[in-house]
Amino acid sequence: VLSSADKTNIKTAWGAIGSHAADHGAEALERMFLSFPTTKTYFPHFDMSHGSGQIAHGKKVADALTNAVGHIDDMPGALSALSDLHAHKLRVDPVNFKLLSHCLLVTLASHHPAEFTPAVHASLDKFFAAVSTVLTSKYR
């Protein structure tokens, strides 16, 4: 459960990320593919080379997270269609959400060290876990 302090930390951090969200999403996705090669099985048609258009799929990740931040009090409603897509069409193994969350935290910490305090780190970790829970909620 996200506390009011968590929500404030998340909104403030995401505001600082701002226009870099798409780049950070792409970098986190690339990190995930390089660090956890089994995650590439869901993207056999992607060009995995650095800077490829396919790695830019990270923009979709960033857009979904921006949407979740904007609807932080109703993430299940805001992410319902995305949850359906991942559960029923793409059938992504839920563990991959944890892997991507970790890569997002590493990426954000490397680009925003001043803003990435222990409290912000904890809040973002809880937020990514909440998003992952929403995305896997329709797997049953």
From Swiss-Prot:
GO biological process: hydrogen peroxide catabolic process
InterPro entries the record matches: Globin (IPR000971), Globin-like_sf (IPR009050), Globin/Proto (IPR012292), Hemoglobin_a-typ (IPR002338), Hemoglobin_oxygen_transport (IPR050056), Hemoglobin_pi (IPR002339)
Span of domain Globin: 1-140
Residues noted as binding O2 in the record, renumbered to the chain: H57
Gene3D superfamilies on file: Globins
Pfam families in UniProt: Globin
Identification of the protein by name: Hemoglobin subunit alpha-1
Organism: Hapalemur griseus (Gray gentle lemur)
